[in-house]
Amino acid sequence: MKKITTINSGVIPLMRDNIDTDQIIPKQFLKNILKSGYGRNLFYDWRYKATSKEANPDFILNKPEYKQAQILVTGENFGCGSSREHAVWALKDYGFQVVIAGSYSDIFYMNSTKNGLLAIELPKKDRTILASIPAKEKIIVDLPRQQVRYEKYQFDFSINPLWKHKFINGLDDIAITMNYAKKIEAYEKEIPNFN
């Protein structure tokens, strides 16, 4: 997992509530078991015209000024719907490192933490300020300080200390377990052999 400490990036405002996993990555694109290749189909039904499959120039991800943004600012209940880890893979593959929402589906939130996508919760008033920032401007997400900053604004957020440790150190669940390899081996030697 890639380390995340401080992200300095523009934001993509997509201030809609109840964006579900099928809107994030539609079911017809779930045939792959790899974690890559999903970014091109992120928000597919909004990014492309239904009749011609051409890019919809009005959708924010298709606007050139937002192409390099790594932070998505969105509404309440993000990632609701079916349990679909592919939704997180699509966001990561597109280039997002951080999603700032009012709330998340529990399963989506856990999938995010396990796949290196930092999911931050902020109240609507704070997200409204962030969503209004011009495309060329950048904000700072400072994980060690648990802050989102832009000019005179500073928004504090909470995160589970273990997840914070995992993000800052680039550790996934397997890497955390491997930190205890010697203790696990010692314990296994103490267990009676029933053969």
UniProtKB/Swiss-Prot annotation:
InterPro entries: 3-IsopropMal_deHydase_ssu, Aconitase/3IPM_dehydase_swvl, AconitaseA/IPMdHydase_ssu_swvl, IPMI_Swivel, LeuD
Gene3D superfamilies (alphabetical): Aconitase, domain 4
Keyword tags: Amino-acid biosynthesis, Branched-chain amino acid biosynthesis, Leucine biosynthesis, Lyase
Any one GO biological process: L-leucine biosynthetic process
SUPFAM superfamilies: LeuD/IlvD-like
N-terminal signal peptide: none
Record field: catalytic activity: (2R,3S)-3-isopropylmalate = (2S)-2-isopropylmalate
EC numbers: 4.2.1.33
Function statement: Catalyzes the isomerization between 2-isopropylmalate and 3-isopropylmalate, via the formation of 2-isopropylmaleate.
NCBIfam families assigned to the protein according to its UniProt record, in alphabetical order: leuD (TIGR00171), PRK01641.1 (NF002458)
Name this protein carries in UniProt: 3-isopropylmalate dehydratase small subunit
Organism of origin: Oenococcus oeni (strain ATCC BAA-331 / PSU-1)
